[in-house]
Amino acid sequence: MNKFATLAVFISVCLAVGSCNYGGQHAGHGYGHHRSISSYGQRGDGSAAAASSAAAAGGNDQRPVEIVAGPRYGGSEQLRPILLDSGYQGGHNEYGRGHGNIGHLVGGGSYGGHIAGGNHGGNYGGHQRGYGRPRWSVQPAGTTLLYPGQNSYRRYASPPEYTKVVLPVRAAPPVAKLYLPENNYGSHGGYHNEGPKY
């Protein structure tokens, strides 16, 4: 345990010194540095294990991770990362001073995607415009089931609507046959008496 703690502290110090040097080299120039991980877990500059062990040991270098769901088959849609830093000094500003610790997972195609992480500084391609920029992105609406059959993710859909059929209204048959008496029923006379005549 002591070896692991010592190694984690050493790696945290190396990362802190490296991030300070990075900020001093690129301050005010408007150039961004982009480190990426391919979908198979190979990091460009070889510090993936260092960052993960420092985060596991509770170091100060905590990087938020954003998951952006992309199209499942085919990656024709270009997805942009969402800025996760708060305030005006961090992230992709046009003055080139701040650097934000951003890690995001961009999905595209059927094999997952890639993770692009760490220290984007300066003018990120010249597309960001300062303080009025939105900190969110608009994703297409739809119901997509991630990893079907492997976990408890649910698909949300609208409740079913049933078609309404208007049935014709017609008179119902009588419930019982009523007895209708003849005209001479209950008269006070003989058998053929037709009643009083005036």
From Swiss-Prot:
Q: Which organism is it from?
A: Drosophila virilis (Fruit fly)
The UniProt keyword set, sorted, is: Secreted, Signal
Keyword presence, Ion transport:
no
Q: What is its main location?
A: secreted
Task: Give the GO cellular component terms, alphabetically.
Answer: egg chorion; extracellular region
Protein family:
Belongs to the chorion protein S19 family.
- Name under which the protein is recorded: Chorion protein S19
Q: Tell me one GO biological process term.
A: chorion-containing eggshell formation
Tell me where in or outside the cell this protein is found: Secreted
Give the function comment from the record. Answer: Chorion membrane (egg shell) protein; plays a role in protecting the egg from the environment.
InterPro entries the record matches: Chorion_2
So which residues are the signal peptide here? 1-16
